[in-house]
Amino acid sequence: LLAEKHDVPLIAFHAILRGGAVQDSASKEGTAALTGGLLRKGAGKRNAQEIAALVDGLGGVLGTGAGLEGSFASGEFMAKDQVVMLDLLADVLRRPTFPEQEFEKLKAQSIDEITSEKDDPGNVIGEYAYSFVYGAHPYARPVGGDEETLKRLTRGDVLSYYRANYGGDRLLICMVGDFSIAAMESRIRARFSDWPKAPAAPPSPPAPARPAGRRVLLIDKPDATQTYFWIGTLGVSRLDPDRVALDVANTAYGGRFTSILNNALRIEGGLTYGARWQAPRFTQSGTVAIYSYSKTESTVKAIDVALGTLAAVRRSGIDPATVASTKSYMEGQFPPRLETEDQIAGAIADLAFYGQERRELEEYTSRVEATRDEDVKRVIQRVYPSGEDLTFVLVGNAARIRAAVGKYGPVTELKITDPLLSGLRKGAR
């Protein structure tokens, strides 16, 4: 996937390998993330310091890691340095050394990060929500693992994951910038065409089951003065045929400052500093959810107001003036997302990863403009959850809100200090 862009002598790349956390073994969650993070910590004949010095000396950028469904390497470099950087990319992806010292260092840092992130519930509530709403499905696996799963990982686990899941058949590379397509294609093929297939089958997660009924996950953070809440269920996949109409609905309902949800909770209600509707999509169904936070004493009021907005849009849809305003907003916001080489490369790679064509970008604003009011109402009815089928995830002072939030459904309670996965597996306290 190559695109020439000659206005500046810069090249950006995004390389993605199918896999990611969905191929972590049960009880060894976090393996993909450690594997991805270690790619640049020793590769070929260079150690971590030498790789960092090379990239820095060229004024370049190199990042590696893993997400839910894929592992990645991305970066930027000057066009004159493309041979050196392509050689480095090939080393990082094909010849990582996974030094024991770097493994132990990154593992310790990852555990510390999980602990420190719990100081701000907004950083972790999504992990709790995914693990709770997806249950036994692979999407329930937190990408970074938890304190317990990381502690039990060894360098051998990382090596096993890499050997099973990295290979030429999994690789997708997109480059955008100041180069000749023919020459760049030749250079990439010279470095990657003989990379053998990964031994393991590529991931093929099953369709997850949408939870029925109401239930509550309450994570106790005794020193909290606010309650963070996530209220939702499963949504749609990346290839949903109504995806553009759904983008319009999502933006109008909770995707901009003047959205219905933020207006009700922040502008009119004064109950929060921000509220939004989150709707990530994956190969299989993602999620749709209200996300916000409020003072402990106004927790129930804020949740009830949020639920009222959800019920209202399901019942009545979104008025034509709001739909029209939202479409104009989206059309204005879209071009700045595709200005730099890195933005373009990332967008094209993301489309290709999910089996979408480049025309998704080229036709996006015209498809937004063509979205009708009835399309928005129809997709809301199909995708947005009813009040009877909702998962509630709350992080706050359980002693002060436990009794009140019980009205939303059966409560499973954890402590913020509990490792995420083992806490959920043990169930209610």
Locations of the language-model features?
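An aromatic/glycine/proline-enriched structural segment found at the starts
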Residues: 135, 139, 143, 172-237, ...
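Short, surface-exposed beta-strand/loop micro-motifs that present aromatic residues
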Residues: 1-4, 159-164, 213-221, 377-382
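Non-catalytic, conformational "gating/processing" segments within enzyme and secreted inhibitor domains
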Residues: 126-127, 155-191, 385-391
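M16 family metallopeptidases and their MPP-like homologs
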Residues: 3, 7-40, 46-94, 106-112, ...
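Short, charged, amphipathic alpha-helices and their helix-cap/turn boundaries
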Residues: 150-154
